[in-house]
Every structure is written in structure tokens, then in C-alpha cells.
């Protein structure tokens, strides 16, 4: 009697979602789509305002614009797949698509942590050392620290 070592590789995952309540999927699709459009519109307006208004070319607004861009990237990496899973009858995600989505989520989360720490430093300098703020957070000072962040 020969025992064979049988292994199966995982190629896709089954998304259960709201299988017990299929009528709610269309309602959730509309709600999530509306929230996604509000996110895109709100962050897009903030980015447009910080880029177009020369009075807002300061570190605080620069970081807020980058945070808005990062928020758009973060939601765009996951929401379209969620919306697609509500519409299609086959509710699966491939292993590679899952790995890419996980990587993007971790990368965006890490970038957001770095960006929020830079924003915290900016506000710390503005509140605790207001007279030194123009020197510490000059364009020559904050441009090199923003290079790891996108935008």
C-alpha cells in the first residue's frame, strides 16, 4: 500500500458576502457606490483647491492634499472589487488578486502612517515653536521628507 502525498494549491477564494440576504446586495451596492463617489468628489475637491490656490501652498495644506490623494488610492484599491462582487453571480477572488489587494492595503496603510507622522510634526512645530515654524517647515525642509509619500 503506497500512500501518496496529495496537495492542492489554492487558486481562488470564495466570497460569501450576503448570501443569506441576496435582496440587500443591490441596496448595499448603491450605498457603497454613493459613498465611494462622495469620497472621490470630496478628496478631489480638496486636492484641486490646494493645487490651484497659491495661498494654500503651505506644508499643512500640502500634507492634506497628499492625504486626500492617498485616501483616493486606498479606497480605489478595494471598493471596485467590492462593487463587482455585488453584481456578479460568481463571488470569487483569485489568489493573486487577493495578494495584490493585501499588498496595496498594507502599502497604503504604511504610507498613511508616515504621512500622518509628518503632519503631526508639522502641527507640533506650528503650536510649540511658532516663531521657528517658517524656518523649520520651509519648502527646502519639508520637500525632502515628503519624498517617500506619493503625490
Curated annotation (Swiss-Prot):
It comes from the Eukaryota. This is Putative olfactory receptor 13C6. GO terms for molecular function: G protein-coupled receptor activity; olfactory receptor activity. Residues 1-27, 83-100 are extracellular. The gene is OR13C6P. It comes from Homo sapiens (Human). Keywords: Cell membrane, G-protein coupled receptor, Glycoprotein, Membrane, Olfaction, Receptor, Sensory transduction, Transducer, Transmembrane, Transmembrane helix. SUPFAM superfamilies: Family A G protein-coupled receptor-like. It is a multi-pass membrane protein.
Amino acid at each position: 500500500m503506497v500512500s501518496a502525498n496529495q496537495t492542492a494549491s489554492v487558486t481562488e477564494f470564495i466570497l460569501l458576502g450576503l448570501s443569506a440576504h441576496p435582496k440587500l446586495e443591490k441596496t448595499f451596492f448603491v450605498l457603497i457606490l454613493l459613498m465611494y463617489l462622495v469620497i472621490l468628489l470630496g478628496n478631489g475637491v480638496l486636492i484641486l483647491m490646494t493645487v490651484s490656490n497659491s495661498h494654500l501652498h503651505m506644508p499643512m495644506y500640502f500634507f492634506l492634499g497628499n492625504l486626500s490623494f492617498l485616501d483616493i488610492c486606498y479606497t480605489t484599491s478595494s471598493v471596485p472589487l467590492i462593487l463587482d462582487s455585488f453584481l456578479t453571480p460568481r463571488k470569487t477572488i483569485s489568489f493573486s488578486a487577493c495578494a495584490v489587494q493585501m499588498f496595496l492595503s498594507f502599502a497604503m496603510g504604511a504610507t498613511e502612517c508616515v504621512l500622518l507622522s509628518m503632519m503631526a510634526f508639522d502641527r507640533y512645530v506650528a503650536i510649540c515653536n511658532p516663531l521657528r515654524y517658517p524656518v523649520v517647515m520651509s519648502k527646502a525642509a519639508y520637500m525632502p521628507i515628503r519624498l517617500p509619500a506619493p503625490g
